[in-house]
């Protein structure tokens, strides 16, 4: 006897399972089954496809008028941080620049101070609250970065919190050491601080899967970033890079040269970098909510990357300064509107390709896969990025069990 059957599904979303990320035109290929059925036993998918009455189960969910998809994958978050920076919104409205806010004690260094002052247990409680919000919105696989400690003690603290979250909630979670995220005030120079972070690589390896660096004007140069990435690979890490967010420094090209698993942001990437994606499996992780939140007009050139047969994914970039959202559904809407992605491209970018960007087996519904699914209160898959700003996730299913039920229930 099977454990659960989800029947009469209006649309069953079945992204294609591949060894490599979907590239170029492949991103627009999505198998959407009308009147579908999913059968689950022992936390695994037994069957997913056209409606069938050939299976029995102890529990049945009628998904008439609903969409079922793989659980979403958020491939770029800064989940563990102390404090918040809502007071900066009024400063920005007054026309204060980032540097002016930084000089007033705000900006990233204020988050660094708050993170350093927050105990590991309190940091865990805050991050857990934010993680549970993600889960309620349909995410069951997450990448979590450090980068607000900027010293040995606090970078380790962030990574330990991330690992504790993964263990407690038994999630598909990957952890990224982003020690070189900024340069703390106490550092004698960018170069000296970078060497401190490189020296930490062997120690943080037990807590982190990836090593990341912020390659940008005023932070770390292309040469420094390459040096760090090479040292990280020597220490056994797969590498990522925050690249070309503001200036076209060539971070995307560097990521491809160093065979990074992903290059993230890429708002200012050059045509040369986009062309180089053609012969690479590096995933371009685009973060349109960041551009939206910062009030900027120029978004990453997703269409140019796809035209060059590149692989792209989408993520929230959840952080307290430039993308204060842990709702990946909102990112899907912004991507459709501002990156000009089709609904099919959006769905692949938050499932199978996002999984490739963090090297996990997720984002698909195939026989034998973990039964990590979302039942959406929506008539079709196009509706979810179309009707933005609310939570469409009705039920979230992890390992075959309903762990979130957002069904509205109230007394008139």
From Swiss-Prot:
N-formimidoyl-L-glutamate binds at residues 148, 319, 321. Belongs to the metallo-dependent hydrolases superfamily. HutI family. InterPro entries: Amidohydro-rel (IPR006680), HutI (IPR005920), Metal-dep_hydrolase_composite (IPR011059), Metal_Hydrolase (IPR032466). It is found in: Cytoplasm. Fe(3+) binds at residues 76, 78, 242, 317. Pfam families: Amidohydro_1 (PF01979). This is Imidazolonepropionase. Pathway: Amino-acid degradation; L-histidine degradation into L-glutamate; N-formimidoyl-L-glutamate from L-histidine: step 3/3. Binds 1 zinc or iron ion per subunit. GO terms for biological process: L-histidine catabolic process to glutamate and formamide; L-histidine catabolic process to glutamate and formate. Keywords: Cytoplasm, Histidine metabolism, Hydrolase, Iron, Metal-binding, Zinc. Catalyzes the hydrolytic cleavage of the carbon-nitrogen bond in imidazolone-5-propanoate to yield N-formimidoyl-L-glutamate. It is the third step in the universal histidine degradation pathway. One of its GO terms (molecular function) is iron ion binding. 4-imidazolone-5-propanoate binds at residues 85, 148, 181, 245, 322. Disulfide bonds: none annotated. It comes from Staphylococcus aureus (strain bovine RF122 / ET3-1). It catalyses: 4-imidazolone-5-propanoate + H2O = N-formimidoyl-L-glutamate. One of its GO terms (cellular component) is cytoplasm. It comes from the Bacteria. Its main location: cytoplasm. The lineage of its organism: Bacteria, Bacillati, Bacillota, Bacilli, Bacillales. Its EC number is 3.5.2.7. It is an enzyme of class 3 (hydrolase). Its cofactor is Zn(2+); Fe(3+). Zn(2+) binds at residues 76, 78, 242, 317.
